[in-house]
A protein has these predicted regions:
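Short, low-complexity, charge-dense intrinsically disordered segments
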Residues: 217-224
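Accessible peptide chain termini
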Residues: 1, 224-225
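A polyanion-binding, active-site-adjacent surface
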Residues: 1-199
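Residue-identity detector for glycine
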Residues: 211-212, 225
Length: 225
């Protein structure tokens, strides 16, 4: 299949990219993304963290565990099912480094985001996902422009693909300390879950086919959290 081969070639090119190292933006290239041909969901994050730099798997640290819990709340049978059905990438493909205080990660430099943008654009063109899950302010702004999380989370935008914004699952974020914002998160997860329920078995089968046989899964409805 031409699209599948094009995706594999694109992924190989991304893994070998070292443009930001050559330009002195970062000291080490560690492009991180994950996904299969046919995935109906596409999640866009900000940038890998230090855990992801080592594992080379998106959202594999503490924030990723929280994201997995959110997706089970949304209606995926398990975190594994969520990741089978979702292509996960970021605005910046490599770890941007720690901040000077050592208590958090640097925001992706605009030049690095610009360097990486063609990877994201090509993935979206090839995969044609049905739903984009936008995690964090930077990813949301990339597709929807500047705006407050309060005005974005809990709503859907565009069609197709439908875009659903989420806050970042980092434990450093205080946004979810507000009960009203937790309700917004629940509403956003419900939108994701409603779409999950509409997926035909054939769509799930196609997204599973690149990684070996999988048993069929049932979707759960969103729960309050």
């Amino acid at each position: 299949m031409q699209g599948r081969a094009e995706l594999f070639a694109l992924q190989a090119g991304c893994r070998g990219c070292h443009v930001c190292v050559d330009e002195g933006i970062i000291p080490e290239a560690n492009p991180t993304f994950e996904g299969r041909w046919g995935a109906p969901f596409f999640l866009v994050g900000q940038a890998p963290g230090p855990v992801e730099r080592e594992s080379r798997r998106p959202f594999s640290g503490r924030a990723g565990k929280e994201l997995d819990r959110w997706m089970v709340r949304a209606g995926f049978e398990s975190a594994d099912e969520f990741r089978r059905l979702t292509y996960i990438a970021a605005l910046m493909r490599c770890f941007p480094g720690r901040n000077r205080a050592g208590n958090g990660d640097l925001k992706p430099p605009p030049k690095a985001v610009a360097n990486c943008s063609h990877w994201l654009d090509a993935e979206l063109r090839i995969l044609k996902p049905k739903m984009l899950i936008l995690v964090g302010q930077l990813a949301i702004a990339r597709f929807l422009g500047p705006g407050r999380l309060e005005d974005r989370v809990g709503r859907k935008f565009g069609d197709p693909p439908v875009m659903v914004p989420l806050p970042h699952p980092s434990g450093q974020s205080r946004w979810l300390n507000d009960p009203a914002n937790r309700q917004r998160l629940t509403a956003a997860l419900a939108l994701i879950g409603q779409f999950r329920l509409t997926l035909a078995p054939a769509s799930i089968s196609r997204s599973n086919s690149d990684g070996g046989p999988d048993k069929p899964h049932r979707a759960r409805r969103v729960t309050q959290g």
